[in-house]
Amino acid sequence: MRPVAPEKDGPRVNEEIRIREVQLIDQDGQNRGVLPTRDALLLAQEAGLDLVEISPNSSPPVCKILDFGRFKYQNQKKASEARKKQKVVEVKEIKLRPGIDTHDYDVKMKAMLRFFEEGDKVKVTLRFRGREMAHQDIGYKLLQKLKEDVTNIAKVEAEPMLEGRQMIMILAPR
C-alpha cells in the first residue's frame, strides 16, 4: 500500500502540478493558451520563476508564471488586512436605576451614543431594589423615554422585559 501524501494547503507549484495540459498565463499577464505542463514548467524555469496553479477547478487548470514566495507573501498580507477590517460587534451594558437624575441620564446617553458610533450593541439594564419592585411602571416609562431618545440612531432589538429584579432592553445601531 502506497503512503498517502499529506494534503497541502495553498496552490500546487512546479512539479506538484501533475496534469497533462494547462492554460498558461506568463509573468507579464499575457494568456499563452493551452500548453503541455512540461513546456509550461520549462518556460517558468527559463524565467527563473515558478509555475503556480491559480485555478485548479477549471478545465484545463489555469497556471501562472510568477515568484511563489512573493505570491504567498501578498496573499498573507491581503488576509491580515481583511482580518484588521473586520469589526467584532460587542454588546456593551448601560446600568440604570428607576430614580435616575437628569444629569446622570445625560451622561449615560452620551456613553450610549459613543457605543453606537463604534458599531456596538447596547444592553440597557434597569435594576430595581427593595420596594422599587412595586413601581415597575416607573422603570418601564424610563425605558420608553430612552427608546424615544435614540430612535433616530438605534433600533430596538429586544423590547423591555422583566428578568427577576431587573428590566432589560437591547438596542442596536442603525
From Swiss-Prot:
Protein's GO biological process: ribosome disassembly
GO CC annotation: cytosol; membrane
Localization per record: Cytoplasm
Keyword annotations: Cytoplasm, Initiation factor, Protein biosynthesis
A Pfam cross-reference name: IF3_N
Gene3D superfamilies: Translation initiation factor 3 (IF-3), C-terminal domain (3.30.110.10), Translation initiation factor 3 (IF-3), N-terminal domain (3.10.20.80)
GO molecular function terms listed in the Swiss-Prot or TrEMBL record: ribosome binding; translation initiation factor activity
Quaternary data: Monomer.
HAMAP family linked to this entry: IF_3
Its job: IF-3 binds to the 30S ribosomal subunit and shifts the equilibrium between 70S ribosomes and their 50S and 30S subunits in favor of the free subunits, thus enhancing the availability of 30S subunits on which protein synthesis initiation begins.
Family (UniProt): Belongs to the IF-3 family.
Protein name: Translation initiation factor IF-3
UniProt organism field: Azorhizobium caulinodans (strain ATCC 43989 / DSM 5975 / JCM 20966 / LMG 6465 / NBRC 14845 / NCIMB 13405 / ORS 571)
